[in-house]
Amino acid sequence: VVARRQAPLIIGLGEGEFICASDTPAIANFTNIILPMEDDEIALLTPLGIEIYDSNNERQYRNPVSLKVSEQIIDKMNFKHFMLKEIYDQPHTAKNWLETYLIQNLENGQYQIKYPFDTNFFKSIERIEIIACGTSKHAAMVGSFLLEQFSGIPTNVYYASEFRYSPPPLLPNTLTIGVSQSGETADTIAAIDMEIKRRSQIKDKEFRPNLIAITNRRESSIGRQVSNIIDICAGIEV
């Protein structure tokens, strides 16, 4: 029996075995098929298979997920340690990210951003709030400066841990951006969930939740929580 509460948990489906871990690197060498669990769920692992129940004891059904090839390759190459490898990977990672999201117009030579989701809701946005923790908040602060400079839209950055207990007043036509490298930051997940719930209680469409998540793990908790995902394409974290 395994249970998840406010921390990530995945179940790996191996050959004649189940493997439980908090993240994919721990099981990547044993299986490439995983079953992510949601918060407050309990799983029974038996010789006949897996049974998942929510906090109301209702049976849950979902399909397993296949790991990307890059997530199964954990090799520090010829570097002394993974941190050094990741530092030297930064130019390639930045190039990969730019090539993924910036498309050049051959007629005028200008670049346009290619979002992996429908951006029609951008038209009504009047303010932006960014929720993050740690170094993600540092990146968010730089991002808020750029957003205000290029879009002219007022942008505020909040510590997710503070946002949870002292949220700003609800304002209409707000874009909420959650930033988490791992996609498993507990405070950021809780803050996004709270923002979704408090905005969903208001019937006025101007207060509806408009959400984007920036993460390195599309299949993470935040990736499942928010449908509009910007993947930073930095590869697996070790």
Regions found by a protein language model. Give the residues of each.
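Glycine-rich phosphate-binding loops that contact phosphosugars or nucleotide phosphates
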Residues: 123-238
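N-terminal segments that mediate ammonia production and transfer
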Residues: 1-126, 136, 145, 149-150, ...
